[in-house]
Amino acid sequence: MSYSPAPAREAPLRGAQSSDPPAEAAAIAKAADGHFWAEGQVNGSRVRFLVDTGASSVALTPMDAQRLGLNTGRLIYDTPIHTANGDSLAARVRLATVSVAGARMRDVDAVVVGRGLPSSLLGMSYLGRLSRLTATQDTLLLQP
């Protein structure tokens, strides 16, 4: 999993599976730190995500996972991953719902990272289900 900002290009994505009616594209502005941060909802609880197109799946910190009601002590951390802070092990989970900027997806594959992840990541297991993801120098547009 990487922490690099989204590339400045347009990338139409296939496989949007939202149960909600089509919505307008939502804009996420680049933060002062150079990253795109998104306020989302997972299973009805707020989570602040770093948008990471280099992450293959949504990745949760143990603290966020616990706030969502996941029993992190009972998860099986057997999936090796690579983060900017080094190698770690993660536990695979499935999230009932993930919503960001009006785009709600059901049954989203995710991992809970055992250590080394400073913030939860909004990765491709969610982003890849959008109908369109457009990145410019300053803005990320999410089209459900």
Q: Would you name each region that the model predicts?
A:
Residues 1-48, 53-144:
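Pepsin/retropepsin-fold aspartyl endopeptidases
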